[in-house]
C-alpha cells in the first residue's frame, strides 16, 4: 500500500498554534526499567519488570498484602499504566448496572447499551490510591454495541511521560497532559465498526490500544469497513500518514521495534500480519494469518517476533526473524522458511498476548491450558492446565523476579515459578471479575478488577 501523508483530520481543541503560545512543547522521556509501565503490557508490550522483589501471596477479600483499593465506576477492561507517581485507567460509566458476562461460552449477541455513557480517564496516586485527576473525554450514546464480555473502554492508555493518549474507538482519540489532565487535542476517527466479519451484526466494540514511539501515536484500526493503520503527531494530533489495510476486524494492539536502526510497526491480522516502517508507513514484510479473530499483541524478544491468534479452526504461533522482508507466508504443508524460524499450527492463543521470559515463551489459551516453548527452537517443554478448569483466561500474563502471573476471569491470580516445568507458587483471590492485564512498578502490582483498582505489595 502507498501511505497517504497528512490525511484529513479534525482537531477539536488545542491546535498546534496554541501549543506554541502556551509553551507546551513537552519532551518525551524514556521509561525507567521496573518503574514505568507506559502502555499495554508495559515497555514494548514485553510484560516484564525486573529489579524489584515481586509479590507472591495476597488476598483482596481479607486485605492481606493489599496496599490500597480504590473504586472505579463504570465498566472498563483497559489495563492500568504507570508513570512516575501516577497510575491511570479509562472507564465508560453509564450510571447503570451494566451487564458483563464472563466465563467460557459461545454467545456472540452484542449488548446494545442505548443509554448515555461518560468516557473517562482517571489517574490516581500510585502510592495512596487517591484521585489525582479525572477527565471526561466524551458523553453520549456509544456509536456501536459491545460484546457481552467487553466494555466501551477496552483500549489501554499510552504515555511518553508527558502526553497521555486515550483511544475510545468511535468516540475518538484523545491526548492529555499527564500531570494535570488538561486536554491537549482530540481526533474524530469516524465510526469504527469492530465486529465479527462472518456475522456483521455482531458488533463487539473497539479494543486495540494506542502506542507512542518517536513522538508518534500509532493506531491500528481493523474494522468492517475501511481498515487502516495510521500515525499521529503526539504533540499536535496531526496525522502523519495512513495506509489502508485489506483485513477484517481485529482487536490487536501493534508493537514497535527497531530493525537496523529503523523503527518498525508490527501488526497482527487474519489476512495481513506484517511490518511497516514507522516513519513512512512503507510495508516491509507480510504474511497471511490463521485465526480469524486476531487479538494478541505481537511480542519481540530474543531476536524474534512472536505472533499468535486463534478462532475459526486455526490457532498458529509464529516465530519470525526481526529482519524479515517481503512475503514470508510459508508454503502449504511447511512450518518454516528463511524468515519464519518456526511455527506451530494448533496451539495459538485467542485472547492472551504471549510472554517471553528467561528464554521461554508462555502461551495460554482461554481455557487455562498453558504451553511453554523454547523461544529459539520452538520445542514445547510442557502443556498443562493452570487451574482446575471452569473459568476463562483473558488478561495477558506478566512477569518479574522469577515469577509469571496469570489472571483468570473469575478473579484468581496464579503465580508460577519460571522454568521448564509447571510449578504454581500461589493462587490469590481478588474477589471480583478480572479481565484487564495487571501492571508492575517498583515491585507493586496494580490490578484492575470489575469495580476497583488494587495495589498489591
Question: Predicted segments — roles?
Answer:
Residues 1, 19-29:
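Short, charged low-complexity linear motifs
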Residues 1-8:
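N-terminal secretory signal peptides that target proteins for export/translocation
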Residues 8-23:
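Bacterial N-terminal signal peptides
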Residues 25-457:
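Noncatalytic, solvent-exposed loop/strand surfaces
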Amino acid at each position: 500500500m502507498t501511505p497517504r501523508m497528512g490525511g484529513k483530520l479534525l482537531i477539536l481543541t488545542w491546535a498546534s498554534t496554541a501549543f506554541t503560545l502556551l509553551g507546551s512543547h513537552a519532551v518525551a522521556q524514556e521509561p525507567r526499567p521496573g518503574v514505568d509501565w507506559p502502555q499495554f503490557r508495559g515497555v514494548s508490550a514485553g510484560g516484564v519488570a525486573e529489579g524489584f522483589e515481586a509479590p507472591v501471596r495476597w488476598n483482596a477479600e481479607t486485605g492481606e498484602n493489599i496496599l490500597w483499593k480504590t473504586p472505579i465506576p463504570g465498566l472498563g477492561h483497559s489495563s492500568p499504566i504507570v508513570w512516575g507517581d501516577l497510575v491511570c485507567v479509562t472507564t465508560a460509566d453509564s450510571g447503570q448496572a451494566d451487564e458483563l458476562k464472563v466465563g467460557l461460552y459461545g454467545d456472540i449477541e452484542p449488548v446494545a447499551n442505548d443509554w448515555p455513557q461518560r468516557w473517562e480517564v482517571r489517574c490516581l496516586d500510585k502510592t495512596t490510591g487517591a484521585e489525582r485527576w479525572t477527565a471526561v473525554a466524551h458523553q453520549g450514546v456509544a456509536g456501536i454495541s459491545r460484546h457481552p464480555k467487553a466494555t466501551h473502554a477496552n483500549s489501554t492508555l499510552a504515555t511518553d511521560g508527558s502526553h497521555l493518549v486515550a483511544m475510545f474507538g468511535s468516540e475518538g482519540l484523545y491526548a492529555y497532559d499527564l500531570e494535570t489532565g488538561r486536554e491537549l487535542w482530540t481526533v474524530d476517527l469516524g465510526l469504527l465498526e469492530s465486529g465479527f466479519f462472518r456475522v456483521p451484526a455482531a458488533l463487539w466494540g473497539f479494543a486495540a490500544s494506542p502506542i507512542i514511539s518517536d513522538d508518534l501515536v500509532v493506531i491500528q484500526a481493523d474494522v468492517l469497513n475501511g481498515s487502516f493503520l495510521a500515525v499521529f503527531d503526539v504533540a499536535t494530533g496531526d496525522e502523519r500518514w495512513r495506509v489502508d489495510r485489506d483485513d477484517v476486524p481485529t482487536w490487536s494492539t501493534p508493537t514497535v521495534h527497531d530493525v537496523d536502526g529503523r523503527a518498525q510497526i508490527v501488526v497482527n491480522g487474519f489476512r495481513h500480519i506484517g511490518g511497516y516502517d514507522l516513519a513512512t508507513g512503507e510495508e516491509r514484510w507480510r504474511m497471511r494469518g490463521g485465526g480469524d479473530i486476531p487479538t494478541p499483541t505481537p511480542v519481540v524478544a530474543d531476536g524474534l517476533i512472536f505472533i499468535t491468534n486463534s478462532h475459526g479452526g486455526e490457532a498458529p504461533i509464529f516465530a519470525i526473524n526481526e529482519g524479515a522482508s517481503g512475503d514470508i507466508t510459508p508454503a502449504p504443508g511447511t512450518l518454516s522458511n528463511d524468515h519464519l524460524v518456526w511455527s506451530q499450527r494448533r496451539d495459538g492463543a485467542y485472547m492472551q498476548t504471549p510472554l517471553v521470559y528467561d528464554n521461554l515463551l508462555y502461551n495460554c489459551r482461554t481455557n487455562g491450558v498453558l504451553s511453554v516453548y523454547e523461544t529459539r527452537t520452538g520445542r514445547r517443554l510442557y502443556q498443562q492446565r493452570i487451574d482446575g478448569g471452569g473459568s476463562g483466561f483473558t488478561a495477558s500474563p506478566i512477569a518479574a523476579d522469577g515469577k509469571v502471573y496469570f489472571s483468570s476471569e473469575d478473579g484468581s491470580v496464579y503465580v508460577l515459578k519460571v522454568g521448564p516445568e509447571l510449578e504454581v507458587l500461589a493462587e490469590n483471590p481478588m474477589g471480583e471479575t478480572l479481565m484487564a492485564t495487571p501492571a508492575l512498578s517498583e515491585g507493586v502490582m496494580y490490578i484492575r478488577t470489575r469495580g476497583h483498582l488494587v495495589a498489591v505489595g
